Amino acid sequence: MLINVMKFGGTSVANLNRIKKVAQIIKKKLINKNQKALVVLSAMSGVTNNLVEEFSRLQIDINDPEYDSILSTGEQYSSSLMSLVLSKSGLKSRSLLGWQIPIETDSNYSRARIKKINSKRILELFRKFDVLIVAGFQGISDDDRITTLGRGGSDTSAVALATSVKADLCEIYTDVEGIFTSDPRIVRSAKKIKNITYEEILEMSSSGSKVLHPRSVELAMKYGI
């Protein structure tokens, strides 16, 4: 069994048309029955920001477990919708929330850290399904409460899952083709970087670049993803 982890951000799944395009990308990856896709999705673009804005109006403490429970719903919606589109295209697909695997985390709500992932559950499901769509950015604490990993946490979800199932490949898809010296949508003179080390991309991420979440880079460096 060859497992390809694929992570798609909010702009990639911003609407139904884009979700259909992503579904085609996933389908093209599965050229034989021995290949499986473990897809990690963010919420549709703008959804998480809208939820955060609502919370700010209510003046709710971000350390409240209910904050994480509601904030995680964006990924639940996009993952279920993607699974429906893939199933309609002829692939055997199902969506999974963090607690259904489970992705176990600490109880540091709104910025939890992953402790353990039940890879056995994922591998068992791949006996029945071609594609598993995992809601990124979330897990479950020891006291059975939904947790979130912090903004950009879906990158961390993808790398952690790739490590757990010993994936053959982990791909992070964005609306920018590659890594640039600065945001090419803002800086026209930005240059594409052909090769980059873990240390260099970690420095970029830690300095505010939105290329990858710093924790995902740390995990990738540690486990050679």
Give short role names for the model-derived ranges.
Residues 223-225:
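Short, intrinsically disordered, charge-balanced linker/junction segments flanking boundaries
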Residues 1-218:
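Nucleotide/pyrophosphate-binding catalytic subdomain
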